[in-house]
């Protein structure tokens, strides 16, 4: 799931790769004003060590493949991460980035994923002048990604940029007023409405891009339902909107008639590839319920989805559910919600995504569980993740998980408050079987203190 970082501060570490990318390559494709950017250098020093450690954790990457991915992030992503935090924030900063490693039961190695909010584009000085939403800067950034990667199709992305980014002067004025008075927690603390996010799957042999759009801004300025706005945007996509519409209609009916609790629609994502192959991904959150019975109702769309893959997926999820919410096996009845450490809020509650392609009859449902809401320490989360990986059949990854965490995050107090793990997501498909994705905060816990500057 796309990560939203609210303060634009920083984080990451030192790794063992021989590659030295401390200065930008002469082949860089980002705008001239971003070259030799001290802000980008700061973010790069923070991101590189964690990436290198997670490559080792995932396994399956050659040194050259790691260098290719690291160079791409250094040259094309770091310049868009925003300004350098100052004072004590520099030593305990959080980057506008989230990294994750995906494990599936049918593959021996994991895959590293990298996602971020481009603060340079969406909150730079230009947003106070002629580009209030950062749309022009976002478009420039997307073109640079397309040039660097080659195999990127922005057909749908351009359409959604136009639909979701607030640019009309009257809408911008209404949004600024709403940001002062009407934002939900914790966004109200920052008086800022995220509108755009992106991610890359950094597979050993390729890079693929995904883009994410947040409907909150448009909902605030138009008064429209965020769910309706997202589903209407899906139906209107060209080409293949008509092939996406049946599942969009099914989800609309489920959320409005048979879902056993209120859900908020927070994101719409797409693969930035040929629309014939691209998935549409709708993200919703539940601040009311997190019981397993509630999850079962969502995965089956109120009993509509009864196919073998859905039922097998629920059976496996049931076997690890106690690990994901940090309770003893059998302790939590299926009908009971698991109390969270903090009052659930945006990004601090249970999330689901529904993804489908044109022509699909049903969506694939994924679940996202905020680990820091249920466990007291990263060590406990690591123990639960190791047990979950073992059930996935990934014994080697399970055995080495805590060791990798210690190596990748050398400054982390694993027995203190949670500072490393964000979420664990789960899904099951007939093609891949069960899979888990573990999401990590990108912060200075991965960096020796004297390496931040």
UniProtKB/Swiss-Prot annotation:
UniProt record, GO biological process: alkaloid metabolic process
Residues binding substrate, per UniProt: 210, 212, 279, 281, 283, 368, 435
GO molecular function terms listed in the Swiss-Prot or TrEMBL record: transferase activity, transferring alkyl or aryl (other than methyl) groups
EC number: 2.5.1.-
Residues engaged in binding L-tryptophan: 95-96
Cross-referenced Pfam families: Trp_DMAT
Domain of life, per lineage: Eukaryota
pH-linked activity: Optimum pH is 8.0.
NCBIfam families assigned to the protein according to its UniProt record, in alphabetical order: arom_pren_DMATS
UniProt family annotation: Belongs to the tryptophan dimethylallyltransferase family.
Protein name according to UniProt: O-glucose prenyltransferase PaPT
């Amino acid at each position: 799931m796309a990560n939203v970082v609210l303060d634009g501060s920083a984080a990451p570490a030192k790794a063992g790769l021989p590659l030295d990318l401390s200065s930008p390559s002469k082949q860089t494709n980002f705008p001239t004003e971003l070259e030799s950017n001290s802000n980008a250098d700061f973010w790069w020093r923070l991101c590189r060590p964690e990436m290198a450690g997670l490559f080792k954790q995932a396994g399956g990457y050659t040194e050259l493949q790691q260098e290719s991915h690291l160079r791409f992030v250094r040259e094309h992503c770091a310049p868009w991460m925003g300004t350098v935090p100052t004072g004590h924030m520099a030593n305990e900063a959080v980057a506008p980035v989230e990294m994750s490693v995906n494990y599936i039961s049918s593959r021996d190695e994991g895959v590293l994923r990298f996602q971020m909010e481009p603060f340079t584009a969406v909150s730079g000085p230009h947003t106070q002048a002629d580009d209030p939403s950062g749309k022009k800067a976002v478009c420039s950034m997307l073109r640079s990604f397309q040039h660097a990667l080659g195999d990127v199709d922005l057909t749908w992305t351009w359409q959604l940029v136009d639909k979701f980014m607030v640019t009309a002067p009257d809408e911008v004025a209404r949004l600024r007023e709403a940001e002062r008075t009407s934002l939900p927690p914790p966004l109200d603390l920052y008086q800022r409405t995220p509108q755009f996010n992106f991610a890359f799957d950094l597979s050993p042999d390729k890079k693929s891009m995904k883009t994410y759009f947040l409907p909150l801004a448009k909902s605030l300025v138009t008064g429209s339902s965020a769910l309706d706005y997202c589903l209407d945007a899906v139906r209107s996509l060209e080409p293949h909107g008509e092939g996406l519409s049946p599942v969009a209609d099914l989800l609309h009916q489920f959320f409005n008639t048979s879902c056993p609790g209120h859900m908020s629609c927070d994101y719409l994502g797409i693969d930035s590839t040929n629309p014939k192959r691209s998935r549409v991904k709708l993200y919703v959150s539940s601040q009311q319920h997190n019981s397993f019975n509630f999850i079962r109702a969502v995965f089956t769309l109120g009993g509509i989805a009864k196919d073998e893959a859905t039922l097998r997926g629920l059976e496996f999820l049931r076997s690890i559910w106690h690990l994901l919410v940090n309770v003893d096996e059998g302790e939590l009845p299926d009908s009971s919600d698991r109390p969270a450490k903090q009052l659930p809020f945006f990004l601090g509650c249970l999330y689901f995504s529904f993804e489908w392609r044109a022509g699909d009859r049903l969506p694939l449902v994924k679940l996202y569980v905020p680990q820091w809401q249920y466990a007291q320490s990263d060590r406990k989360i690591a123990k639960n993740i190791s047990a979950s990986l073992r059930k996935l059949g990934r014994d080697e990854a399970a055995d080495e998980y805590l060791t990798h965490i210690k190596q990748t995050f050398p400054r982390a107090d694993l027995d203190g408050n949670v500072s490393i793990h964000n979420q664990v997501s789960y899904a099951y498909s007939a093609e891949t079987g069960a899979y888990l994705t573990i999401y990590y905060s990108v912060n200075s816990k991965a960096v020796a203190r004297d390496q931040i500057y």
